[in-house]
């Protein structure tokens, strides 16, 4: 063990010696839920002596709500948010699809998923029996009984992912990727519009989750990711919502890492950002994400909790960017 440690230290010194251009600060903007675990990964990367374009890259992680980041990236970056990022990791393709549509030249290559978390229904404990055997296909027609809130905004990827799952079910895709034409079809638009129109009012997913812990029956459920519900329930005792997994192919937040090619950053920043993504997706390096309740390739599923089973989920093939945008627009129009 002493020899291995010594070798690692020597490798680090050798790598540092090749950083002929010095250190390079590389900003990474991420969804707030990713901040803690990705800071741990960044510390490991920064200490590894990694060299990018003759620099020693130093990753700096900052949390920004995805709608705020999207507005800044598609418009003028606000310095109050921090330095311009070279890498953006939001919750889902809901955000990267819009960036790619607005400024395609600023997204370098295809974003890479660094983790995933399927959408579930967070259900009030007393209402749980009414959700037995429920399917994504059923949700629009049973909304009066199920009373599912469908918030939009910064923490509401669950709503948009649930919409993808429902759209695939009513569009009869059999788990295949939903196309833009299918997302705009009358049957899909009509089903989602009806589902949203009858939804209980709720400003945010966080507010809906809080409401589910209090007495009442106006609101019985809200779609969120597994990780979101597990994080909310942590340390709250028994009076928390429980996850229900509707039957059928299920969409997931995929935490896409998009390398950004902007005027304010250099090729060296882009290279370092891409190198960090590669490091993050190598076996074992994303363990902090798994420990935080995300599903990570090569890591065991998170441990079952009183609220979330983290069981087997039938995956839904990712929808096209055009379909994602169309479904978001449908849910936001109600």
PLM regions with names:
Residues 1-9, 262-334:
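Extracellular/periplasmic juxtamembrane helices and adjacent flexible linkers that interface
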Residues 33-40, 44, 68, 72, ...:
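Extracytoplasmic/secreted proteins, especially bacterial periplasmic and envelope-associated proteins
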Residues 126-133, 168-176, 263-273:
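Short helix-loop capping/hinge motifs at secondary-structure junctions, enriched
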Residues 29-31, 143-186, 192-198:
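Short beta-strand->loop
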Residues 109, 113-121, 189-190, 236-265, ...:
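Periplasmic-binding protein-like
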Residues 173-245:
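Ligand-binding pocket segment of bilobal, Venus flytrap-like solute-binding proteins
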Residues 11-155:
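N-terminal segment of the mature folded domain
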Residues 43-51, 78, 93, 100-101, ...:
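Sec-exported extracytoplasmic/periplasmic mature domains
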């Amino acid at each position: 063990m002493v020899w291995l440690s010594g070798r690692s230290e020597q490798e680090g010194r050798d790598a540092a010696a090749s950083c002929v251009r010095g250190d390079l600060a590389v900003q990474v903007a991420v969804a707030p839920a990713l901040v803690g675990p990705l800071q741990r990964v960044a510390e490991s990367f920064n200490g590894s002596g990694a060299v990018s374009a003759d620099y020693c890259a130093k990753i700096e992680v900052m949390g920004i709500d995805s709608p705020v980041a999207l507005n800044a990236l598609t418009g003028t970056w606000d310095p109050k948010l921090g330095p311009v990022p070279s890498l953006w990791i939001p919750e889902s393709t809901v955000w990267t699809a819009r960036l790619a549509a607005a400024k395609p030249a600023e997204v370098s290559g295809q974003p890479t998923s660094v983790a995933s978390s399927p959408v579930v229904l967070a259900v009030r404990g007393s209402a749980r029996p009414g959700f037995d055997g429920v399917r994504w296909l059923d949700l629009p027609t049973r909304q009066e009984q199920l009373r599912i809130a469908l918030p939009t905004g910064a923490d509401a990827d669950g709503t948009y992912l649930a919409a993808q799952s429902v759209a695939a079910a009513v569009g009869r895709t059999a788990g295949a990727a939903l196309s833009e034409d299918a997302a705009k079809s009358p049957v899909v638009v009509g089903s989602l519009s009806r589902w949203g129109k009858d939804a209980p009012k709720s400003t945010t997913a966080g507010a809906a989750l809080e409401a589910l812990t209090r007495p009442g029956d106006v609101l019985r459920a809200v779609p969120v990711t597994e990780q979101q519900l597990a994080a909310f329930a942590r340390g709250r005792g028994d009076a928390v919502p429980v996850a229900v997994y509707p039957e059928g192919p299920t969409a997931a937040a995929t935490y896409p890492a998009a390398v950004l090619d902007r005027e304010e950053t250099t090729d060296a920043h882009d290279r370092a950002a891409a190198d960090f993504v590669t490091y993050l997706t190598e076996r074992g390096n994303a363990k902090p994400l798994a420990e935080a309740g995300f599903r990570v390739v090569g890591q065991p599923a998170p441990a079952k909790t009183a609220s979330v089973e983290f069981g087997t989920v039938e995956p839904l093939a990712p929808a096209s960017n055009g379909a994602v945008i169309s479904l978001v627009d449908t849910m936001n129009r109600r």
